[in-house]
Amino acid sequence: MDDESKPPAPDLFEHFARTAEAVAATTKKLKKAAILGEYFATLTHDDLARAARYFAGQPFALSDARTTNVGGSILSAALMNATGANAEQLSVSYTRWGDGGDAAFEVFSAAKLNNLPSLTLVRTESLLARLSATRGKNAKTDLLSETLSRATPLEAKYLVKLLSGDLRIGLREGLVEDAIARAFHQPLTEVAMANMLRGDIGEAAVRARTGRLHDVEMRLFHPLKFMLATPASDLADIARTMPGEFLVEDKFDGIRAQAHVENGRVGIYSRTLDEISARFP
């Protein structure tokens, strides 16, 4: 068996990336969930939490206010620094694939850097935290360039996808919840409830593995995931969906907000779970 076919160590980001490739290769939801579940079972508790968030396209838990603030210009500059590609080459790749991660894979493959897999899930978490704490475009670019210069093409592909906020492998948060439930033989409703109450699919995954889904409670100033409306074509459609009695009311324009209040302290959170208290008097 050559090195290419050997599965990488579970804690490596390369293993995460190969699993993502396998998920992307099938359109069957049950197969996607099975692939994820098999991978999740190989991880430590901490790496399970990290991987669950990353597969949901979340660099940080939804309840975590941090963001990386890494946009397309920083990603492009870092990719060029790491590979020696020029702006035209990167633009051609992006136009061909329409995805930053796929473009990264192409320019990294062309560069033939011969890097070995070395990025771990914990070092990925550290990089994301440092990017969040770093101020200034140049400083962020230098930090990301340093990591990418040691990356394999597959590591670069999925690091760029993660920083973009969407892996684009036919996977949504609900399917990650389903994979967690199947992997650890827990009710999907309890996994989803834990994720909603904590705003952290990583914590929900660890609780599912350790059998601690039942004791999840809401915490003030830790926002809950919002329940979003489901569109209906007409009243008959609503009646079919909700055969019992129901009320209908006008929808008012505005924002969805969540208010947490205790002992004079007020926290207001947006539908993306960001704190927006300072925007209100």
Briefly describe each language-model feature range:
Residues 1-281:
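N-terminal nucleic-acid-engaging modules of covalent nucleotidyltransferase systems
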